[in-house]
């Protein structure tokens, strides 16, 4: 019965996406997508704090050796009115950079133009703390961070952290959640990753040492490192220490979906 409900939700989601796609295609035929590129730079101390509240679109954040925040934002909409209504406000101080994005107003009529997205590409000091990233719908990628911690929340879409050697608290409501490491380091880190509806994947090197606690409420947990899945009612769970001197703690949770931990073999 649960599988049937899950399948029906997926069918409904697919139908909605196709319907929205047809609306977007009609708008594109009526007029091309307008763009406005915004580029800004702000100094930020290596131990500073960064936060971003985005609107629908994409966010790519890269940790660098610099002591500044470089922002490239591409605003997109179907009309000049909605393009100009997208506001990007930056509060920049020596130890804090905070970006707030305001979307165009919600139209009163159901079939009115609802366009308005921002594609962010942001470089920040790799040792900075990411206090908050909020993205409603789209794709969020965080790469190469080594600060105190990362906190990120995505309502719908895909979230990826890659080679981020710091504590992480990351959440996706619906879509896909990925935690990737090409190699591991001895620095102790703790990762709390949770997805409500969708799959969670982790990729770790073969020689990784870590404590894994993964629970899928209505799905399966699988790992290339261990076949020791246990079931408690509808829950699938793996709770195991892999390797010696494990200083990395992985806490993974999936509501409706699966969790898989795979090995990176070079």
Residue ranges and their predicted role:
Residues 1-266:
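Intrinsically disordered, low-complexity terminal regions
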